[in-house]
């Protein structure tokens, strides 16, 4: 408890600039934790929706039934289901034009799925750049507060005739709190960023694999009246 109070006292006695730096870093830390929690829940939902659709896709349900379900459930569909829907939509549009070259039809569907994939990946990666910025910049902001605080402490000692460690230590300690808060903001952001980046890479690989598998299915069904074969 005494240690907590001493830290509070250090913050209260710090210069205005150092206090502003501390307040900024604390605000950034709160925003960072909010972004981390949102990303945890959103990635969990993305994985769950992708797994659910993938099970349904390989269960034997016809492609037309899957497309109808995707259109009906558009607001709540996951990335994989939306990619599937965009591919099926483009596939059917090109087939209606009675294009003889089936490769052109499949390539068009694949391009539509790749475009949808990029949109989904951009959405999943949202807030990652913020976490990266917090992790890389916060320590330097804290260091700026520390340097400023030390300069302020030594400036205040200029008028003293005798300077001892007991005289200098409080000012330096006040300044070092800024660096500590900067690290407190940066470390969770860096750890979360690395974890999310790995998880998103796995999601991206899974979606790309699905695009290739579905493209092969469309290739086999390009000449059929009602594509359904796996």
What are these model-predicted stretches?
Residues 15, 33, 66, 84, ...:
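Residue-level signature of catalytic and energy-coupling elements of molecular machines
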Residues 26-46, 143, 150, 185-200:
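Alpha-helical transmembrane segments
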Residues 1-55:
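Hydrophobic membrane-targeting segments
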Residues 48-141, 150-164, 191-230:
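Predominantly long cytosolic amphipathic alpha-helical stalk/bundle segments
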Residues 161, 167-175:
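Hydrophobic alpha-helical transmembrane segments and adjacent short intramembrane/lumenal linkers
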Residues 12, 16, 22, 126-129, ...:
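Internal alpha-helical transmembrane segments of multi-pass membrane proteins, especially GPCRs
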Residues 175-189:
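Hydrophobic alpha-helical transmembrane segments of polytopic membrane proteins
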Residues 9, 132, 145:
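A cross-family signal for key residues in well-ordered alpha-helices
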